Amino acid sequence: MDGDNKTYTIYILSDSTGETAATMIRAALVQYTTKDVNIIRCKNVRTDTQAEAVIEECFERRGMLAYTVASQGLRAKIREMASGKGIPYFDLLGPLLSTLDTFFGQHSEDTVGALRAVDERYFKRIEAIEYTVKHDDGKTFAELDKADIVLVGISRTSKTPLSIFLSHKGWKVANVPLVLDTPLPEELFKIDQRRIVGLIIDMDSLQRIRKSRLEKFGQDPGGSYASMSHIAKEIEYAEKIFKVNRRWPVFNVTERALEETASEIVRIIAARLGLPDSVIF
């Protein structure tokens, strides 16, 4: 489809940051790649007078209006003013709230800035995921002090799966591998020791997991990595490390569901740091 030379203007009116509305608009605009669109975000609009000024400007520029406003009264006023001006408009929040009102059998609470809280939680989760990926398997110890949780364990003790799972819950997680006869990084002992958790696993389970992984990648499962004698040495080394560092709680991940272990880790960390129970999932 051919484009045109016109620049289209979309006004976003929000009682908070407008970030959620902007994200939704951009997602929709992917379907209109040939159009030149200018998005103007008007934040913290919470009165009829403020809304009227935005609508007047939108009218003068022949734009479209999209809005996210919690107040039912203000939404109605915006709808009335936009309709009166003949402005194309769309309420991004109202239809959802109306459906939820019916579903829950009660009216919404008109909480201003509720979407901002959603935005903040979203960006916190993204930040946590990025941090966790960067600090997976000892890739870097820079900013280790920024971690909410640090997992320490030998290979195949679920360090990475646990880290990623927790990061999607908003926790910045670093994981540090225990390598036989290799000293732990100095940075590990310079951070808050209450945030560190040890992971251990039974020998039989570990051997089975390692052999399966080697076979999956077409490698010889009979090497030292999956041998019982080598595994015994690794576990003995890990137990020695954990015995010296008694402040680190140790979790045995053998045959445990990932979610169960993650929840227990968060519960322990929250208790140690004095965090509210609401952080536990």
From Swiss-Prot:
Main enzyme class: transferase
Pfam families associated with the record: Kinase-PPPase (PF03618)
Protein's name in the database: Putative pyruvate, phosphate dikinase regulatory protein
UniProt-listed PANTHER family: PYRUVATE, PHOSPHATE DIKINASE REGULATORY PROTEIN 1, CHLOROPLASTIC
Signal peptide span: none
Protein purpose: Bifunctional serine/threonine kinase and phosphorylase involved in the regulation of the pyruvate, phosphate dikinase (PPDK) by catalyzing its phosphorylation/dephosphorylation.
Keyword Ribosomal protein attributed: no
Gene Ontology molecular function, alphabetical: ADP binding; ATP binding; phosphotransferase activity, phosphate group as acceptor; protein serine/threonine kinase activity
Classification of source organism: Bacteria, Pseudomonadati, Bdellovibrionota, Bdellovibrionia, Bdellovibrionales
InterPro entries from the UniProt entry: Kinase-pyrophosphorylase, PPDK_reg
NCBIfam families: PRK05339.1 (NF003742)
UniProt keyword terms in alphabetical order: Kinase, Nucleotide-binding, Serine/threonine-protein kinase, Transferase
Catalytic activity: N(tele)-phospho-L-histidyl/L-threonyl-[pyruvate, phosphate dikinase] + ADP = N(tele)-phospho-L-histidyl/O-phospho-L-threonyl-[pyruvate, phosphate dikinase] + AMP + H(+); N(tele)-phospho-L-histidyl/O-phospho-L-threonyl-[pyruvate, phosphate dikinase] + phosphate + H(+) = N(tele)-phospho-L-histidyl/L-threonyl-[pyruvate, phosphate dikinase] + diphosphate
Family under the similarity heading: Belongs to the pyruvate, phosphate/water dikinase regulatory protein family. PDRP subfamily.
Domain of life from the UniProt record: Bacteria
Record-listed E.C. numbers: 2.7.11.32, 2.7.4.27
Binding site for ADP: 153-160
